[in-house]
């Protein structure tokens, strides 16, 4: 007997349903068309498993055979199936169809009833929204059947697992415990910071010009809700058709999981990067992609050829300019650019004004986009293009001087700007190539001291790489430690690359400088880069004459005290580096130096990975073949013995323990001198591959052998940190014992006199003044002004803030300002790295890390049950090295009270409205999850409680990638490897995690029914799925449907997001049309748990829940589209009140400007008693004021103004206006931007 839903339908009845039928009765033809299209799509998808019985007198009936995800996806067939019969009633899809389940084999009566109940709930939910549903019902049923496959079949099919299988590896008792929620394991959170990667990008800028190129303006200032995405109310039919095409045209791909080579699903090719890099790649920056495993290389030949082709097409060689640009650009345009260049030579009156002039001409429509681009190219490029177009004229002209290029472009040596490098330094000898540049020993002509100067060529086309280098250099400049190489200063110079020059690589600014690539990985120089102007970054560093490798080469006599002395200094330097969030990654004796006093200095951070910057630059790895020093290459061959296993195995998550492995090898070389190179090779090979140590050495130094084994443990978590070594591994020193005693007294004694004396010494004014002088002499040179942003950047920031405020106010939120700092003891602490400050009174202050906790305390104190608030304020993050805290502008929007899911939808609507006004449509992805759902997934996959935090940390690395994207599937390959190798998770558990990633994460409409079918319907899980379903329903009402994903593997960013939570990412497509890593813009969710925690602790009362979102405005500022321009409405045009004659007429000017201020007209005057008219015109030009109100001597009678002249400089219009009519005239003229002819008549 089949299980039918008809009886239950009769019991439910429902006047509400009749109301819906009445509303949609007039759309019967449209509903029939939807059903017809759905049946067509279902027949194409399920083919012989789908039967349609149609009768003209009754609604159609559809019978679909249900199977688990098995044969269609590449598994062995199973002995379980059922028949789903769907009878659509008039009014479908707004009326729920009648459903019947007929078990065929392997399905018990109880399971059939459960399945029918599940499908009824799913159908009712879809019918309320009027959405076609049969395909979703089938998917939910398939997931349900996959979960009840008999265990015998699971055991047989384990060897042939694929990425799409929901296999039953976990014992049934474990699956029944999903409802334990947080009590079943730790609540994991906080692996991504809203402002990750922004610390150094704001605090440091070495770019010569921070001004942005702004192309076009936004047309209107008021918020336009029509710009929000509008989608059709239903996307299922299109998805059916796409799915049908896939099923008919292509069989489903099979992707086995038991080998690395086949881990990538859906035939996504895995990119491989060859270890050989071109010279330009080495000079471009620190970070390059690591080479992948050799067994993945065959898949990428086509990709590599495509990339190389695109690069060649995008290059600006002289030949391509001459051949390609001339047919597209007229000779008239070329001649105009030539004349502009002649007028703007360095010796002329318009020196260096070419960019401004060309921009103005482009805005006026005189210069096209192509001509503007050509005008901005380097002189050699344009000259060749010009000569190619006018070669006949230049040969036959009687005035050859006219056709010649400007003297400063064809004779660069005639007038060279000053080169700081050539003026201040004298080259002594080359030291070799470093991690991201060439290094030369130089003598400073001013102080006579020797320095190592590194020169890096910044390629204009690779702005992200250049920005990354700048951030790294700024970071390294803050590593002020006695055992770390000092970085003194850095600066930019412009030069010309000549790849055929000799070894001398000195720069001649704006001239024909020579730069040699000798000694780099590749000597092949692309022809199109010849003789192009480039920007070079110079870094002045501390010079260290010897390396530890050189010491090892003459290390014949072993001294135990000397070994402990060196290793302590090395570990102290490492501890400082790791404390700043930096991994060296190339820690070898070649990069450990000795200064003039024979103290250890750690240097050459060419392969360093900055943990605090990696959120901006996740690129899968770094090249290990970049040369490191002049003594020995730091490529893969040179660093083999020192490379940690996790780096060799391409683990995606690398921490500072990789350096500790390298330290182990250095430690062993210090304690075991080698007689020959062969002896070193044999012993270190056995140590690395087998973990074997010379037995004689182990017996002589058992403690050192034990420490070495810990340092070189294959598992990073088993290795000690540098701080732990300093505390426990070294022989005690007398000064350390004295310091420990002082610290113990400070922490335990009731007498605060010791603490007060220490604080007094810290804040001693003489000591602080001395430190200030020292740091000012040694710190990397930066802008000597204290203005944080340029004028245009400030204007853009203000514009974004105003948009954000306006959206908040539209939703009736009230502004509540948060106190930016508080005493550390004033509120409970969460486990986060907040910025803490010490006052001269010994009190500890904490700067705001986030803006929500103070608001929750305010809710609790004021017992608010319904409230909307917003706040835009700075939060603070720890900086790297000796730098002030990093301020990050954040906007919060919160709703207290209201219906669950509905208020969540509103805060998402707020974010969509803001981003739609700033970025292009569809540029943001919304990732949804639920705390109870995440716990259910942990149990479903079999992740033990002790592993959840590390698993979540690894999975969060792909959270910024769109679910089901090829980039995310590629990232999973490496995450899977680390889960198996580091955590030693059973392969069956990792396979289930991959099933979650491949089937339960993705488009919300597809993932939700699959989750309902797969997960047990316990109360917490069912509640979580219902809340997600309701949220999606509300979002559709506001037309927020596209780019909404469910990501059940996404952990929350805060501990209090234990219900619905979300993350919003800004996505940008690359040149190949695929999306890169998303940029985190906003995080949010419900925080009922936090509200109740605070209320229970402080007031013992219950308050309604709350939901909020935090928007990273600082991130938005860094990713503003180039076509965004603040609204400069001419209504707000400033007026300059001027005078002509009459001794300056200062009183009259002051009176008139005050009157304009009272009428809310922006006005100013030149603040001098008697300015000349020329001075006033110059003032207007400098301050971009177009409208002048001129008071003349003849227009003043008895010290009273009778009339004035109103002049518009841009329109070249003028009118005499009486004093009484002036305000009205200005307001009317500004309303039409002064351009209506009737204004001036």
UniProtKB/Swiss-Prot annotation:
Major location (coarse): cytoplasm
Assembly notes: Homodimer; homodimerization is important for kinase activation by uncharged tRNAs.
Mechanisms controlling activity: The kinase activity is stimulated upon binding to uncharged tRNAs.
Protein name listed in UniProt: eIF-2-alpha kinase GCN2
PROSITE patterns: PROTEIN_KINASE_ATP, PROTEIN_KINASE_DOM, PROTEIN_KINASE_TYR, RWD
Family listed: Belongs to the protein kinase superfamily. Ser/Thr protein kinase family. GCN2 subfamily.
Active site: 586 (proton acceptor)
Reaction(s) catalysed by this chain's protein: L-seryl-[protein] + ATP = O-phospho-L-seryl-[protein] + ADP + H(+); L-threonyl-[protein] + ATP = O-phospho-L-threonyl-[protein] + ADP + H(+)
A cellular component annotation (GO) from this entry: cytoplasm
Limits of the Protein kinase domain: 425-731
Keyword Ligase listed: no
One annotated GO biological process: cellular response to amino acid starvation
GO terms assigned for molecular function: ATP binding; protein serine kinase activity; protein serine/threonine kinase activity; tRNA binding
UniProt xrefs under InterPro entries: aa-tRNA-synth_II/BPL/LPL, Anticodon-bd_dom_sf, HisRS-like_core, HisRS-related_dom, Kinase-like_dom_sf, Prot_kinase_dom, Protein_kinase_ATP_BS, RWD_dom
SUPFAM superfamilies membership: Class II aaRS ABD-related, Class II aaRS and biotin synthetases, Protein kinase-like (PK-like), UBC-like
């Amino acid at each position: 007997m089949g299980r039918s839903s008809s009886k239950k339908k009769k019991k439910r009845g429902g006047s509400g349903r009749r109301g819906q039928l009445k509303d949609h009765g007039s759309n019967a033809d449209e509903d029939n068309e939807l059903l017809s299209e759905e049946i067509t799509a279902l027949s194409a998808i399920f083919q012989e498993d789908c039967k349609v019985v149609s009768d003209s007198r009754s609604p159609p009936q559809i019978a679909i055979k249900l199977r688990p995800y098995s044969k269609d996806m590449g598994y062995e067939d199973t002995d379980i199936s059922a028949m789903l019969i769907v009878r659509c009633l008039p009014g479908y899809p707004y009326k729920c169809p009648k459903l019947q389940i007929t078990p065929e084999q392997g399905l018990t009566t109880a399971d059939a009833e459960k399945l029918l109940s599940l499908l009824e709930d799913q159908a009712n939910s879809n019918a309320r929204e009027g959405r076609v549903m049969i395909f979703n019902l089938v998917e939910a049923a398939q997931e349900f059947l996959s979960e009840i496959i008999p265990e015998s079949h699971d055991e047989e099919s384990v060897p042939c697992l694929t990425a799409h299988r929901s296999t039953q590896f976990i014992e049934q008792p474990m699956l029944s415990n999903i409802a334990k929620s947080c009590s079943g394991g730790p609540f994991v959170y906080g692996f991504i910071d809203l402002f990750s990667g922004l610390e150094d990008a704001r605090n440091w800028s070495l770019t010569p010009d921070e001004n942005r190129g702004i192309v076009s303006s936004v047309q209107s200032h008021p918020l336009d809700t029509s710009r929000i995405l509008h989608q059709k109310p239903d996307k299922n039919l299109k998805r059916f058709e796409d799915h049908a095409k896939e099923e008919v045209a292509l069989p489903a791909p099979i992707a086995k999981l038991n080998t690395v080579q086949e881990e990538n699903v859906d035939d996504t090719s895995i990119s491989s990067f060859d270890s050989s890099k071109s010279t330009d790649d080495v000079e471009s920056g620190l970070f390059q992609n690591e080479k992948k495993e050799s067994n993945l290389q065959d898949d990428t030949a086509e990709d590599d050829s495509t990339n190389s082709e695109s690069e060649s097409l995008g290059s600006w060689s002289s030949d391509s300019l001459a051949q390609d640009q001339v047919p597209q650009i007229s000779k008239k345009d070329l001649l105009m650019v030539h004349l502009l260049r002649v007028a703007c030579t360095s010796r002329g009156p318009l020196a260096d004004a070419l960019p401004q002039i060309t921009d103005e001409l482009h805005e006026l429509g005189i210069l096209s986009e192509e001509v503007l681009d050509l005008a901005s190219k380097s002189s050699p490029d344009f000259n060749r293009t010009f000569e190619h177009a006018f070669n006949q004229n230049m040969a036959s002209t009687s005035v050859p001087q006219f056709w010649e290029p400007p003297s400063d472009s064809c004779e660069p040596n005639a007038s060279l700007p000053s080169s700081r490098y050539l003026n201040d330094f004298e080259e002594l000898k080359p030291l070799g190539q470093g991690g991201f540049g060439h290094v030369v020993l130089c003598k400073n002509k001013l102080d006579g001291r020797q320095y190592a100067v590194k020169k890096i060529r910044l390629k204009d086309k690779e702005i992200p790489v250049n920005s990354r280098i700048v951030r790294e250099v700024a970071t390294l400049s803050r590593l002020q430690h006695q055992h770390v190489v000092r970085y003194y200063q850095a600066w930019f110079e412009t030069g010309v690359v000549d790849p055929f020059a000799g070894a001398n690589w000195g720069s001649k600014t704006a001239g024909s400088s020579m730069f040699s690539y000798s000694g780099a990985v590749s000597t092949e120089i692309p022809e199109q880069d010849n003789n192009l102007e480039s920007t070079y970054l110079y870094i002045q560093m501390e010079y260290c004459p010897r390396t530890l490798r050189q010491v090892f080469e003459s290390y014949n006599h072993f001294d135990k005290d000397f070994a402990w002395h060196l290793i302590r200094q090395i570990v102290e330097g490492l501890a400082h580096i790791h404390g700043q969030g930096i991994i060296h990654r190339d820690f070898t004796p070649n990069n450990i130096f000795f200064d003039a006093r024979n103290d250890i200095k750690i240097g050459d951070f060419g392969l360093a990975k900055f943990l605090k910057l990696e959120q901006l630059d996740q690129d899968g790895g770094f090249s290990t073949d970049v040369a490191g020093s002049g003594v020995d290459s730091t490529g893969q061959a040179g660093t083999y013995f020192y490379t940690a296993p996790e780096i060799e195995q391409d683990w995606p998550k690398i921490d500072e323990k990789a350096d500790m492995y390298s330290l182990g090898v250095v430690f062993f070389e210090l304690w075991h001198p080698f007689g020959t190179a062969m002896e070193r090779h044999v012993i270190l090979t056995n140590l690395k591959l087998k973990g074997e140590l010379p037995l004689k050495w182990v017996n002589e130094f058992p403690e050192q052998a034990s420490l070495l084994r810990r340092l070189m443990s294959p598992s990073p978590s088993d290795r000690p940190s540098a701080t732990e070594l300093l505390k426990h591994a070294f022989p005690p020193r007398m000064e350390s014992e004295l310091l420990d005693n002082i610290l113990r007294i400070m922490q335990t004694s009731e007498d605060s006199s010791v603490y007060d004396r220490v604080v007094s010494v810290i804040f001693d004014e003489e000591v602080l003044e001395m430190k200030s002088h020292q740091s000012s002499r040694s710190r990397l040179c930066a802008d000597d002004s204290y203005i944080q942003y340029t004028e245009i950047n400030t204007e853009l920031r203000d514009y974004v803030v105003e948009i954000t405020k306006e959206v908040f106010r539209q939703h009736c939120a009230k502004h509540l300002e948060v106190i930016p700092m508080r005493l550390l003891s004033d509120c409970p602490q969460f486990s986060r790295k907040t910025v803490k400050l010490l006052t001269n009174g010994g009190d500890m202050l904490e700067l705001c890390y986030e803006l929500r906790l103070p608001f929750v305390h305010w809710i609790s104190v004021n017992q608010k049950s319904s409230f909307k608030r917003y706040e835009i304020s700075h939060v603070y993050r720890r900086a790297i090295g000796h730098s002030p805290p990093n301020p990050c502008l954040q906007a919060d929007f919160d709703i207290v009270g209201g219906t669950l899911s509905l208020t969540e939808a509103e805060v998402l609507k707020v974010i969509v409205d803001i981003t739609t006004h700033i970025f292009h449509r569809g540029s943001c992805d919304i990732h949804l999850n639920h705390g109870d759902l995440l716990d259910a997934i942990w149990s479903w996959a079999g992740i033990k409680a002790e592993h959840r935090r590390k698993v979540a940390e690894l999975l969060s690395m792909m959270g910024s990638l769109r679910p089901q994207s090829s980039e995310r599937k590629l990232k999973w390959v490496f995450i899977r490897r680390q889960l198996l190798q580091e955590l030693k998770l059973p392969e069956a558990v990792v396979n289930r995690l991959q099933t979650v990633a491949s089937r339960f994460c993705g488009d919300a409409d597809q993932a939700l029914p699959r989750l309902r079918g797969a997960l047990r319907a316990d109360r917490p899980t069912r509640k979580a799925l219902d809340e997600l379903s309701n949220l999606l329903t509300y979002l559709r009402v506001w037309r927020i449907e596209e780019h909404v994903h469910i990501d059940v593997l996404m952990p929350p960013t805060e501990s209090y997001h234990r219900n619905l939570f979300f993350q919003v990412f800004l996505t940008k497509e690359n040149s190949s049309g695929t999306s890169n890593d998303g940029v985190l813009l906003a995080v949010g969710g419900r925080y009922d748990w936090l509200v109740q925690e605070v209320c229970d602790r402080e007031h013992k009362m219950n308050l309604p829940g709350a939901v909020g979102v935090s928007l990273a405005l600082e991130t938005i500022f860094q990713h503003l589209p180039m076509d965004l321009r603040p609204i400069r409405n001419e209504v707000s045009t400033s007026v300059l009140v001027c005078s002509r004659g009459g001794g300056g007429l200062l009183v009259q000017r002051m009176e008139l400007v005050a009157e304009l201020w009272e009428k809310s007209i922006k006005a100013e005057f030149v603040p001098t008693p008697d300015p000349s008219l020329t001075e006033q015109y110059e003032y207007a030009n400098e301050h971009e004021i177009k409208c002048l109100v001129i008071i003349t001597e003849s227009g003043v009678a008895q010290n009273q103004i009778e009339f004035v002249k109103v002049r518009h400089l841009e329109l070249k219009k003028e009118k005499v206006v009486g004093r009484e009519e002036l305000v009205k005239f200005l307001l009317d003229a500004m309303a039409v931007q002064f351009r209506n002819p009737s204004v001036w008549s």
